[in-house]
């Protein structure tokens, strides 16, 4: 699935934007995935405090609750009937789980508890317990962003009947 953000912005512009964000928030984003500072992410786990404000949008000036963050572009699957999220670019704490990120997305789009939401990375449902930092390292785009799509339906999976 092609990202609408990728379609609207050429690679050079996306890469420059990722670098601008990295520099602006250098205290929150490690400079390199192999830097000594980035290895601190896997330290002793702290109990997460989950609130709708746990994830900062790029425009927010409020500090993050975690030491490092990953850059995420989050978009609705084009034909999904679920609400559209207000912002696309996020700095997500690296030690946040996928399940916690889904909770934040649910809150931002004001999705009622009885409605389902599915998120996809490269058209695959990531494990709920996976850390956002590990998903980022495995699936980040060459421009520096992790592209996540969400839908009200499991559009890429399901059961086939014979």
From Swiss-Prot:
Residue ranges the record assigns to the propeptide: 158-162
Family listed: Belongs to the ATG8 family.
InterPro entries associated with the record: Atg8-like, Ubiquitin-like_domsf
Pfam family, one: ATG8
Region annotation (Disordered) ranges: 1-42
Keywords (A to Z) from UniProt: Autophagy, Cytoplasmic vesicle, Lipoprotein, Membrane, Vacuole
Lipidated residues (Phosphatidylethanolamine amidated glycine): 157
Function of the molecule: Ubiquitin-like modifier involved in autophagosome formation. With ATG4, mediates the delivery of the autophagosomes to the vacuole via the microtubule cytoskeleton. Required for selective autophagic degradation of the nucleus (nucleophagy) as well as for mitophagy which contributes to regulate mitochondrial quantity and quality by eliminating the mitochondria to a basal level to fulfill cellular energy requirements and preventing excess ROS production. Also participates in membrane fusion events that take place in the early secretory pathway.
Knocked-out gene: effects: Abrogates mitophagy.
Protein known as: Autophagy-related protein 8
């Amino acid at each position: 699935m092609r990202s609408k953000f990728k379609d609207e912005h050429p690679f050079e512009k996306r890469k420059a934007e990722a670098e601008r964000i990295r520099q602006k928030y250098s205290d929150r984003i490690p400079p390199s995935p192999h830097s000594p500072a980035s290895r601190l992410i896997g330290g002793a786990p702290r109990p997460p405090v989950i609130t709708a404000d746990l994830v900062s949008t790029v425009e927010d000036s409020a500090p993050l609750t975690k030491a490092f963050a990953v850059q995420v572009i989050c978009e609705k699957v084009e034909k999904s009937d679920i609400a559209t999220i207000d912002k696309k670019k996020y700095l997500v704490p690296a030690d946040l789980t996928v399940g916690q990120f889904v909770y934040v997305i649910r809150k931002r789009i004001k999705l009622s508890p009885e409605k389902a939401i599915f998120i996809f990375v490269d058209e695959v449902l990531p494990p709920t317990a996976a850390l956002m930092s590990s998903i980022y390292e495995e699936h980040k785009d060459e421009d520096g962003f992790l592209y996540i799509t969400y839908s009200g339906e499991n559009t890429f999976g399901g059961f086939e009947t014979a």
